[in-house]
């Protein structure tokens, strides 16, 4: 019985709003104004540190796993484009890099910054003139895991821009997105 009452109350609220009888309705052509401003803001990158055993393990993971990856090995498939009609190597760089940016955000250092700078610089160097960054040859674009991999490239580039404000990464991400839209088309 209670779910039925809640459902009816919800339908009544929707009907009242649709009829314009709600006092909280904002006319369609007028922007809504904020009555209450956000009081909660995220802490700046690097401002929160975890201590103790867990903090030590996090630091070890960041230093010895995330920042110790072989960048050349992660970027090489973007140069060689070996995936053809099968493969999903294009996701590896983006997944690793997004995690590396989280690690850098948690424990920013000059050494970590050099690692992520090098990784993004080397990946962006593989961008073709039309904007594509991926591991598939031209004849296999949009096939198999190509779009999936491009998504991870975009996430990595945007994570880098979010923390560093380096516009080259944002521009590379825009070109990747524009290329995908041009290939896949609207809709």
Please annotate each region the language model reported:
Residues 1-4:
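Positively charged n-region of N-terminal signal peptides that target proteins for export
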Residues 7-15:
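Bacterial N-terminal signal peptides
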Residues 20-92, 110-135:
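Low-complexity, Ser/Thr/Pro/Gly-enriched N-terminal "stalk/linker" regions
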Residues 48, 52-56, 95-110, 152-167:
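Well-ordered alpha-helical scaffold segments within catalytic/enzyme domains
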Residues 84-98, 111-114, 118, 144-155, ...:
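Aromatic- and histidine-enriched alpha-helix N-cap/loop-to-helix transition segments
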Residues 137-187:
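A conserved hydrophobic secondary-structure block that centers on an alpha-helix together
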